[in-house]
Each structure stands twice: as structure tokens, then as C-alpha cells.
């Protein structure tokens, strides 16, 4: 029974959010994506955060019980009725040492915004992001910025 439940959860989230978004953005240099197009689970809000965010910041700001150590990552947390339903980290250190550029980052602030916040939340119907595909000497990397 436990193996069956694990298999269902693993199947449901078998491909990372990052991989799904990269696949969608792969043919374009810039597109608008809706986060709900990439999720197969219930959620009503997502929280996007940057590397200087502490777990306590998230708990206090959104009144949720969350105990994951965020470290120096970018990431996204999906919430449904104040419960975490899915989370994914985009490590700044997850890069090819020949490339030296993180492959994938979702920023909590708009592109070229003068005030760069540590985290931001987006209701499901407003979770739209501009996905920008950029070329480096050793391949491509992707940057997402909220448009709302």
C-alpha cells in the first residue's frame, strides 16, 4: 500500500516544474506562461522566493506551517488552503561549471524593477510569468519574471 501511494505521488510529480517550463519555452526566446498550465495538483496561491529568504519569512508572511530549510536557493511553493501542496528549488549552485550560469531561475520581482523583493505571492489566476530564453557560450538558460 505504501509503495502504491509513493508510486502515485511520484507519477503525479514525475517531471519537474522546471523541466516542463523549459520544454515549453525551448522554441521561443520570450513567451508568457501561466503557472497553472504546468501543475497537475490543486493550489490557490504560489510563493516565489529568492536566496536571501528565510523559512520564518515565509511562515510569518503567509501564515503557513512550513519547515523546509531554504538555504541559498530560488524556489517556488504552491499552497492550497494554507497547506503546502508542492515545492521546487532552483539552486544557484546548480550549474555546469563550464557554463557558470544557473540554468533556471524564477524571480519574485518584475524584470528591470528597481526594488527587488525577497519573495512574492501570486493567486492562481494571476500567476503569469515572462519566460526568457538566453544563450550563453555553452547552451541556454532561462529566466522567469512575474508580469502581474
Predicted features, each with a name:
Residues 2-69:
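N-terminal export/targeting and maturation segments
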Residues 55-56, 84-86, 139-141, 148:
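Short, surface-exposed beta-strand/loop "edge" segments at domain boundaries and coil↔beta transitions
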Residues 66, 70-83, 88:
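Short, structured surface segments that line ligand/substrate-binding pockets
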Residues 87-95:
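A short acidic/small-residue loop/turn micro-motif
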Residues 96-100:
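A short, polar/proline- and glycine-enriched secondary-structure boundary/capping micro-motif
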Residues 101-148:
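C-terminal partner/receptor-binding element of secreted or periplasmic proteins
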